[in-house]
Amino acid sequence: MKEGFAEKNKLFFVLTNSRGFTEEETIKAHREIVNNVQIAADETGMKYCIINRSDSTLRGHFPLETEIVKEEMEKRNSWKVDGEILCPYFKEGGRFTLNNVHYVKYGEELVPAGQTEFAGD
């Protein structure tokens, strides 16, 4: 994490591929990530913001991941997380959200994600 904080860039990624994790593995991994980010921030004196990016068809461990990140960040800091921004969209992959329904584009047709093969994954 310290290498990420030392980079010229203002942003770096921690790739977990946690969609394939069990619930227990997800909790452990996200606690470890926040802990390591906090240690690096404390050692460098830098502030940070964690952005949790998920799968474009909303598979995985939501809201568990963001709940763990929020809980761990608030344990280690005097500030509170105010909320979450959900923005399910991936144009290149044909993923769109319209009127609160998430769609997968098949050819020219938009199919609700819950009615696709992704829903059971």
List PLM regions with ranges.
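Cap/lid and interdomain-hinge subdomains that line or gate substrate/regulatory clefts
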Residues: 1, 8-12, 21-50, 56-121
